[in-house]
Structures are given as C-alpha cells and as structure tokens.
C-alpha cells in the first residue's frame, strides 16, 4: 500500500497519524503501527455499501436530517419506539428531514428499492445527562468513596459485601451523607479469585458474586445442610481466619462462599417451583438472555478447568476447541451441564437482588444520589465477554497510554478494545446494554478514563506501548446515548478526566452535563498555588485522592514516594526531585488552608515542621467541604489516618494490590469520636454553602 493510500486508510479507520507527546511536540505514528492496527480492525468501508449508515444519533432539538447515497428514489418507513409507523419517498443525494416531532428514544428507519431494503437505527437524545433535583436546586452533597472489598465488619466473611454496604448507607445517612461511591462491581473470576483487579473484569454487564452477603440469603438460613456446615468447627475456623486477615484472602473467601451457596442452591431447587422467588429468578434468566447464560457457562467451565494449572489464565489457555462460546465442544458441555449453568445464573440473581435492595434502602433514607457505580474502561483478554463475543473486541490489540516521563515506553493495560466500527454496525447496542447494566439501581455512574469516549491508545499485540496510536471513537454519538440512558434510568454521570485530557473532550463533557473529577492533589494553578474552594466548578465531584493515589496521610508523610522507590517504580535520579516537589506541594497546600480559614491563624505555617494530626486532617476535610463542587467524595482511609495505598499503579506482583483492608470495622469506625467529629464538620460545611455557580 502506497504512503498516501496507507494514510487515507488509517484516517478512514479512525487511526490518528500523529499525537502530541510528553514534550508538547507532534510525533508521527509509524507505518508499521498503521498497518498493524488496520489489520486487526473491522473494515470501516463495509458500512458505506448501504445508502445510509447503520445508526444515526441526534441530540437536542435541532434539524434531524440524513442524506442517502446511491441514485434514484427510495421508499422509506419509520417505525417509532412507541409503535407508530410513518412512510413516504425520498431522493438519493438530497437531504431527508425525519418527520417529527420524534420523541427521545430508539426508532427504526427502513429504506427500500425494488427487492432490496436497508435499515438505520435512529436515536433521539437529550443534550445533557440527568441531574438529580437536589443538585439542580443548587444543593451540595457529600458521601464516602469506598473500595467495598476493603470493608471490615463483625458480620462479613473476610471481604466487604452488600450487607456491609447496606449498613454503610445507614451510618452515612445518619451523619448527613448522601451517597456511597463504589469500586467497579463487575464480574471477575470465581474460579481464579486471586485475579482481583476490579478494573480487569470478566464482564461489565454482570456482578461480582463474591459480594453476596451469604448470611442474608434465605435458602442458606433455611437449609439444614447449610446450617450444619456453617456451625462446624472447620468452617468457623476458616471464617475467623479470613475475617481477621490483614489482607483480603480472595481464594479463601470465595471457597467459603461457594461451599455455602451450593448448599443454599440445593435448598432453592427443592422449593416449590411456583414460589415468588422462583418466578423472579426465572424472569431474571429470561431477561439476561445469552449474555447471562454464557457468563454462567464461562464461570462453570473455568472452575472445572482449574484443576489443570496450565489452563488457569482463562480461555486463551484452554484447548483450541474451547476458546469460543459457540464451538461444538462448548455447546455440548452446556447441554450436559444445565444445572451448573443455572447455579451460576442464580448467583447473579442473588447479587442483583441484594444490590437492588441497597439502592432501594438508600432512597428510603432520603439520599438523592444514594449509590454510584464505577464503569471500567474495558474487560480482560481472558474474559467471558471476549470469549462470547470475539467479533466486538480486537483481541490482537490492547488499550494503554502513550509514553510519558515516568513511563518512557508507555502503558499497556492488557484490555482488548471494542472496535468502534463493529459498535456502529450493531447500532451501538453493546454500549447501550453496558450502560443499562451499570446504571441500574444507582444514582450516578462514574466512567473510568472517560477520554475513551473520544479516543483510545491502541497497542498492537506483541509490541510495547510506545508503538501504539490513538483510535477515534464516535464521541458525539456515544455522549448522546449516554445522555438518553442517563435520563431513562435517572442516573447522573461522572467522568474520570484526570491527567492530560484534550480540550475537545473537556468541552464536550461540560456541554453534555457530565461531571468532572477534581482531586485536591492536582488542583494547582500554574504558579503552584492550590485552587481556592470557591473556584471549583459546580459541575464536578471533589476528593482528596483516589484508589490509584496516596491516602491523605500517605501524601503528607511521603510514604508513597518511599514505597515507589522501594518497588523500583522511579528512576534513581527522579526520587530526590519527587521529594522536593512534594515538599513544595505540602507548603502550597498549607498556605491554601490558612488562606481559606480552614486552620486557626495561630497554627503552624511551615509544612516541614508539621506532621499529620487530627487537626490538620480536619482542616483538609473542611477545605474540601467548602469547595463549590456539587459533590464531595471522602475516603474512609483518610478518616482513619491510614498510610498504605490500596493500589500502586505500575505494579503486578511487587505489591498486594486490591487486598489491603480498612484498619477498623464498620462498627468501630462509626463509634470513633474523631471520625464522627470530622464528618460533622464536613456535613455542616456542605450545608452552609448550598448556593453556588
């Protein structure tokens, strides 16, 4: 392929020919990378064989026009979502205005000529995402940002669960809190529970069954076999060990829960098939369709294959005949293991029932947001989703990030990207299904790496991340669908837009009503001064930190830098500069606290002489509570003065990511006078500044 033809093919496929590097300079993408990415993509030209694209999205109330390709006259028929049918004729090459008024939703336009017909999905969307009435009225709310697996309690089985979540909602509501923000609850790998990253899931449509509160499952309570197992010395010993462990022992917890739930499942099966629970479960299975069936089959097959240590990495490690859900061997297994599939479907039903109950409870407590979920940027290569739908995912590429100063070879996240051309060919149904699954039963959805709506850095298989390129996604269409589903499910949207984000996506997100994320550590002006509380944008959520960053105490004591040096994450000459930079950040933050009146005038003015104390902790929380952001998210780790991070980006085996528990139980946290005093300050401060921009 000649140079001009190669570049044009790359442009047609959405592959950027250059990008802005860490030095602010344009850097060209190599021809090798262009060819490699073109080879793994679906052909974007296939959609051009139809007179109209497979889908068209119209946002707001402007003109809704399409210009059909080809020649001559077509007959058209428009079937609205509500069942109304309209028809007429149009001429190729001339703008065709859709008959109106069309309500917001999903409609179907069919063109026909002779014996041929073509269909286009018409999506009519609002311009902006949903906003809860309380926030629309100018109220400022706060809540807790919780990694659910870290929660300790006197009742759980060694990992935070939906029972703990329910209690957390009660505790927060009593203290003026409005929501609990959660880590991704996506399905992981019950058969390989040690693969615990919530950001490398098996499916973004289904839940992680390890969060089921087994003690609250009726069939566990009513099963004689389950109760005998539960009361045995062996079970109680294993439970105590898992509960008292400093880190989450995923394998031990999952083994306990699966053993208990097998007993409960046997009891459920023996019950009257006409019971309300059986009808509810059957309806759930019908609604879940093939997606749920093959998620369940995948979990069952993976568990069966765990005995062979060479097959523990998911389907890529399985024999060739098992690497796709539609292969004959897999279909035969499914036919022979219907009961096993039903068991895993039942676990998904239990998880959904319990999570839904938490949402309902949050609403009865008067919370305007209640729960917010987190949507990971992708699924792992060896996931149930890629196994069941390999056409949608480009398995010979991976998502990552271009080189920066701390990562000269870039980042490879090991997540195969969705092909934007396949998404479009399917009328964006995979994206719609994913949003619906994650917006269900919650008041807000956080989208991790929200820049993925605009572009993703694709890395060809076998290459380092510096050999990648940006691939464009249909951002206007995706934002329109996001707004439509947001309104339908009454779920506001938060975009994780940290780091270097193109101004293009920043403006689009703001116009679409997507909330920005403002992390205290990053809110410094060019002169290094921290942004004043009143200058935070109202359309944002503020926080001190995130799961990828040091805790408040860890930041102040610079423990994250010491840990990074120990783990070999920083070049030797960078560590000293990082400590100097941190010292300057601390001084700038202390200056900001004094300027905002968050600290008494007589208190220490030099950061180098100040250790983290309860008074300083309260001052930082008071500063955050005073920000004009409509939402404020606080981490329990910071209430407790914890120093160790829950995740260290850039590590795999060097650090026990996703395993560090909170230092106190839920019961102890909310009986702690310091914690209650701090939360009282936060709640009062938020209520005192309700009016804003």
Question: How does the language model describe each region?
Answer:
Residues 633, 641-691:
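Structured C-terminal cap/extension of enzyme domains
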Residues 1-50:
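Long, contiguous interaction/targeting segments characteristic
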Residues 131-134, 166-174, 359-364, 431-445, ...:
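Short amphipathic alpha-helices and their capping/turn segments at secondary-structure boundaries
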Residues 191-352, 378-631, 637-639, 653, ...:
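Alpha-amylase-like alpha-glycosidases and glucanotransferases acting on alpha-linked glucans and related
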Residues 142-148, 153-158:
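Active-site-adjacent substrate/metal-binding segments within catalytic domains
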Residues 344-376:
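Conserved, well-ordered alpha-helix/loop/beta-strand core segments that scaffold catalytic motifs
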Residues 41-71:
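Extracellular ectodomain segments of secreted/surface proteins
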Residues 64, 72-141, 157-171, 175, ...:
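Extended acidic/polar, glycine-enriched regions
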């Amino acid at each position: 392929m000649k140079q001009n033809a190669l570049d044009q093919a790359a442009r047609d496929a959405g592959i950027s020919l250059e990008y802005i590097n860490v030095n602010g300079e344009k850097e060209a993408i190599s021809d090798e990378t262009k060819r490699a990415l073109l080879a793994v993509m679906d052909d974007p030209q296939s959609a051009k064989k139809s007179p109209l694209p497979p889908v068209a999205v119209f946002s707001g109330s402007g003109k809704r026009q399409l210009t059909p390709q080809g020649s001559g006259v077509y007959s058209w028929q428009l079937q609205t979502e509500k069942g109304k049918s309209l028809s007429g004729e149009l001429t190729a090459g001339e703008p065709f205005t859709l008959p109106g008024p069309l309500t917001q939703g999903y409609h179907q336009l069919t063109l026909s000529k002779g014996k041929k017909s073509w269909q286009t999905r018409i999506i009519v969307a609002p311009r902006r995402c949903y906003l809860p009435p309380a926030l629309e009225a100018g109220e400022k709310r706060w809540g807790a940002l919780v990694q659910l697996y870290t929660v300790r309690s006197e009742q759980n089985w060694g990992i935070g669960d939906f029972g703990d979540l329910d209690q957390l909602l009660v505790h927060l509501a009593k203290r003026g809190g409005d929501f609990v923000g959660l880590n991704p609850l996506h399905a992981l790998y019950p058969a390989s529970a040690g693969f615990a990253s919530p950001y490398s899931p098996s499916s973004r449509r289904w839940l992680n069954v390890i969060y089921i509160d087994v003690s609250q499952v009726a069939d566990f309570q009513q099963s004689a076999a389950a109760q005998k197992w539960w009361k045995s010395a062996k079970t109680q010993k294993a439970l105590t060990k898992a509960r008292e462990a400093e880190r989450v022992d995923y394998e031990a917890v999952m083994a306990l829960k699966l053993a208990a739930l097998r007993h409960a499942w046997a009891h459920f099966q023996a019950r009257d098939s006409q019971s309300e629970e059986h009808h509810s479960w059957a309806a759930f299975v019908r609604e879940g369709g093939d997606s749920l069936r093959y998620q369940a089959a995948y979990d069952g097959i993976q568990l069966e294959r765990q005995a062979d240590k060479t097959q523990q990495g998911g389907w890529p490690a399985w024999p060739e005949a098992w690497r796709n859900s539609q292969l004959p061997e897999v279909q035969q297994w499914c036919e022979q293991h219907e009961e096993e599939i039903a068991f895993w479907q039942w676990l998904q039903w239990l998880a959904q029932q319990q999570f839904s109950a938490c949402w309902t409870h949050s609403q009865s407590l008067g919370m305007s947001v209640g729960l917010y979920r987190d949507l990971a940027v992708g699924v792992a290569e060896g996931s149930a989703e890629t196994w069941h739908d390999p056409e949608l995912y480009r398995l010979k590429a991976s998502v990552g990030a271009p080189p920066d100063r701390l990562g000269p070879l870039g980042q490879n996240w090991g997540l195969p990207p969705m092909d934007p051309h396949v998404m479009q060919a399917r009328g964006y149904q995979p994206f719609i299904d994913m949003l619906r699954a994650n917006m269900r039963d919650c008041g807000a959805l956080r989208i991790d790496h929200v820049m993925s709506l605009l572009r993703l850095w694709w890395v060809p298989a076998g290459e380092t991340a510096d050999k990648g390129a940006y691939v464009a996604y249909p951002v206007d269409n995706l934002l329109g669908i996001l707004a439509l589903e947001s309104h339908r499910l009454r779920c506001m949207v938060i975009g994780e837009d940290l780091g270097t984000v193109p101004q293009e996506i920043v403006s689009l997100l703001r116009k679409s009503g997507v909330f920005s994320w403002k992390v205290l550590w990053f809110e410094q002006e060019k002169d290094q001064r921290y942004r004043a509380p009143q200058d935070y944008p109202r359309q944002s959520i503020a926080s001190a930190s995130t799961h990828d960053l040091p805790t408040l105490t860890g930041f102040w004591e610079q423990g994250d830098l010491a840990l990074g040096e120990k783990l070999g994450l920083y070049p030797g000459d960078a560590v000293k500069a990082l400590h100097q930079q941190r010292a300057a950040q601390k001084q700038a933050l202390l200056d900001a606290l004094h300027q905002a009146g968050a600290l008494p005038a007589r208190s220490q003015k030099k950061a180098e002489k100040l250790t983290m104390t309860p008074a300083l902790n309260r001052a930082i929380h008071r500063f955050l509570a005073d920000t004009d952001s409509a939402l404020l998210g606080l981490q329990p780790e910071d209430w407790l003065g914890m120093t160790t991070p829950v995740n260290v980006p850039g590590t795999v085996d060097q650090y026990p990511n996703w395993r560090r528990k909170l230092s106190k139980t839920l019961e102890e946290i909310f009986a702690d006078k310091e914690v209650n005093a701090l939360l009282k300050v936060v709640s009062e401060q938020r209520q005192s500044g309700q009016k804003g921009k």
